[in-house]
Amino acid sequence: MFKKYDSKNSIVLKSILSLGIIYSGSFGIYPKADASTQNSSSVQDKQLQKVEEVPNNSEKALVKKLYDRYSKDTINGKSNKSRNWVYSERPLNENQVRIHLEGTYTVAGRVYTPKRNITLNKEVVTLKELDHIIRFAHISYGLYMGEHLPKGNIVINTKNGGKYTLESHKELQKNRENVEINTDDIKNVTFELVKSVNDIEQV
């Protein structure tokens, strides 16, 4: 349903090139060093490359893990077969509730306010199911596409003032998955998310 996740390699490549230019005598920046200096420089090269590469690769892997999990259009027997997990203006059935997702995406200083909602049956669901459906709706607008983790939270607000916070940069915690929520008690879902300028935003 969604565009296949593909990663970019420019950050790691630029890091390696910049390190080579700064520390290697072969580029003509510094005079040729003796063997002990070259060995020291080589060790320094490897240490700095490790600092650059590990966080980047780790972040990309986590983004892909989140995308792979939340882009699935089924969860515990529930599915998006009727396209109820994306924006709709269809009249509701008696047993349905429409939950509006209200908030902002910020990309490179520009603020977007996408229009979206989800349509659910009036029933008790788990926080794991609700978390999945809400993030699925956000993925249709670009969440977890690219190489960088988003920043910010998604908040489920109930009519009695309760709140359930979903942290966009990581999966829902295991100990919260079985919390039960009646969909008819949900007021709305709010969010303030910040995307990297280097990722393509689909809003």
Swiss-Prot record:
Plays a role in the inhibition of the host innate immune system. Inhibits phagocytosis and killing by human neutrophils by interacting with multiple neutrophil surface glycoproteins in a sialic acid-dependent manner. Keywords: Secreted. The keyword Secreted applies. It comes from the Bacteria. The lineage of its organism: Bacteria, Bacillati, Bacillota, Bacilli, Bacillales. Induction: Under the control of the Staphylococcus aureus exotoxin expression (Sae) two component gene regulatory system. The keyword Secreted applies. The C-terminal domain contains a V-shape binding site for sialyl Lewis X. It is found in: Secreted. Residues 164-180 are annotated as: Sialic acid-binding motif. This is Enterotoxin-like toxin X. Belongs to the staphylococcal/streptococcal toxin family. Its main location: secreted. SUPFAM superfamilies: Superantigen toxins, C-terminal domain (SSF54334). InterPro entries: SuperAg_toxin_C (IPR016091), Toxin_b-grasp_Staph/Strep (IPR006123). It comes from Staphylococcus aureus. GO terms for cellular component: extracellular region.
